[in-house]
A protein has these predicted regions:
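Glycine-rich, aromatic-lined ligand/substrate-binding cores of catalytic
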Residues: 335-372
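Short, positively charged
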Residues: 80, 321-325, 420-421
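Extracytoplasmic gating/loop element in the C-terminal half of outer-membrane beta-barrel translocons
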Residues: 88, 364-464, 482
């Protein structure tokens, strides 16, 4: 039996957006929205050249032509192919930059539908899948056009302020799509009357012409410019296993395990990151390493007399200071990616008659986290001190037993004002934790009222009561986090633990 489907089409989208913003003063939230303005705040804003009003316009245009064909034979062999031709005004003005043809081919072999599998009753499903193609995406934050903005000159007196047009971004007429060749191979298995289901996918992507803001010589008037500056390789796999060990009229137990692995490597990069770009909490991009790699300044102990930390600086010398703007990264230590390499979850559902219990765990591993900065050269009575200071250096000889630096006196602190050793300590190998965790995500208990009871009412068709709790227990996390949550963090470090939530739900169907 042959099955052939074809479709062709055109897609056109446009969007015109206008943005207005203004700052209002004197709005009293606690007094019903009454406005009370002190004229001195307006005077200060005008004299400070503060723009309290702004507006902007954007015009997006997008067009695509596509064709897709699917062919299947006897539900055993399935082939598919797609061709697209996309264009947008968000990219460079050159035609070769704005317009791009992409394609994809895929095939599937349903082995379980073959005639030689008819006698194999314990195999319910067995199929192989594969696809390969060229894909493309558009970086929504990038713009190829020159950007001019209207600003006021910075003048001390109001009658001297003038309106000027400032160049904010340079044009890049050759800015084009981010592209990638993607290979995907998969297998689907169902065994023993679907008591065991396995889905496995392996994928590999070679990305090129990736877009980012690239530092340049500033000859054109701006220091940064959007450009296609990098190539990257990424690969991984996704595994899903479903098992039903018990399946009877009154008893049922179903278990589902999911596991994903992803790794990346930048194979070509035109950027020149500084030390700070690579050691901050959000990670940096460096050729030969994963996207979002976290590096650290190498910590080399504490000074015997002062307890001030020592490091290997940008020149390879052990010293108190490190120049964060240096582009020599040879002496940094690679910690790992900030994004987890392994992610997954494990769900178990137990049912006895009309009562069911679900337990869901999540986990991740393979990433590193920069701990939030906690050390300064000097402190005051207003500073909140971390408990880590209980283990700080306090007298000569303590450097043999602790890696926590001292709180120095005023004279010693004055000598380090231009060196910032404590800031370097915040970004050293001592201030890194593993992002691995295992979490009891949810537990829910549901009771469904039996159908024969509901039939007596002649009104209700379904009634169930559910009691659930989420974020109940962080089973494992790195002790260096001191209770902070490794799953949710940003450029400022890690977030506080998620709050536990409990819900009761009553569902009634008529």
């Amino acid at each position: 039996m042959h099955d052939l489907n074809m479709i062709a089409g055109v897609q056109v989208k446009y969007a015109d957006r206008q943005k207005f913003s203004n700052t209002g003063y004197g709005y009293q939230y606690n007094e019903g929205g009454k406005v009370t303005v002190d004229y001195r705040i307006m005077k200060m804003m005008i004299e400070s050249n503060f723009d309290y009003y702004g507006m902007g316009t954007t015009r997006d245009r997008f067009a695509a032509f596509y064709f897709n064909a699917d062919y299947g034979f006897d539900s055993r062999y399935i082939f598919s192919g797609t061709v697209r031709y996309d264009g947008t005004n968000a990219l460079g003005s050159n035609r070769s930059a704005r317009w791009l043809p992409t394609w994809n081919v895929s095939a599937k072999w349903n082995i379980s539908n073959e005639h030689f599998m008819e006698s194999t009753e314990w195999i319910d499903q067995l199929s192989l899948r594969g696809s390969y193609g060229l894909t493309a995406s558009m970086n929504s934050s990038a713009s190829a056009s020159a950007k001019f903005v209207n600003e006021n000159t910075k003048r001390p007196y109001g009658n001297e302020i003038e309106s000027v047009i400032t160049l904010e971004a340079l044009e890049n007429s050759e800015l084009t799509w981010e592209k990638g060749h993607v290979l995907n191979l998969g297998i689907d298995i169902g065994l023993f009357n679907r008591r065991l289901d396995v889905i496995f996918d392996y994928w590999r992507r070679n990305s090129f012409d990736l877009i980012a803001s690239l530092k340049n010589s500033a000859i054109g008037g701006t220091l940064y410019k959007y450009a296609n500056y990098a190539d990257m390789e990424s690969r991984g796999y996704d595994l899903a296993i479903g098992i039903t060990p018990i399946r009877t009229k009154d008893w049922n137990w179903k278990s589902n395990l999911t596991l994903g692995y992803t790794t990346t490597k930048i194979t070509n990069s035109k950027n020149m990151p500084s030390i700070y770009n690579m050691i901050n909490a959000s990670g940096g991009n460096r050729e030969g390493y994963p996207v979002g790699s976290l590096f650290s300044i190498q910590y080399k102990g504490l000074e015997h007399d002062t307890g001030v930390p020592l490091f290997i600086n940008e020149s390879g010398v052990i010293a108190n200071s490190v120049y964060f703007q240096s582009t020599n990264l040879d002496y940094l230590k690679y910690e790992g990616p900030i994004d987890p390499e392994y992610t997954g979850g494990w769900s178990n559902t137990f049912r006895w008659k009309d009562l069911s219990l679900n337990v869901f765990l999540t986990f991740q591993a393979g990433n590193k986290i920069r701990l939030a900065p906690a050390f300064k050269t000097s402190y005051s009575e207003l500073d909140a001190m971390s408990s880590v200071f209980f283990d700080r250096w306090m007298q000569p000889g303590d450097e043999k037993y602790t890696n926590v630096p001292s709180i120095v006196d005023v004279l010693t602190a004055d000598g380090f004002k231009s060196k910032y050793p404590y800031n370097s300590y915040n970004y050293s190998t001592e201030r890194v934790a593993k992002g691995d965790f295992i979490r009891l995500k949810t537990i829910s208990l549901t009771y469904k009222v039996p159908k024969h009871y509901l039939q007596r009412t002649k009104v209700l068709s379904d009634v169930s009561l559910t009691v659930a709790g989420s974020n109940l227990w962080l089973i494992y996390a790195d002790k260096k986090l001191n209770g902070q949550d490794p799953e949710f963090y940003n450029t400022g470090g890690v977030a506080q633990p998620l709050s536990r939530q409990f819900t009761i739900a009553l569902n009634i169907g008529f």
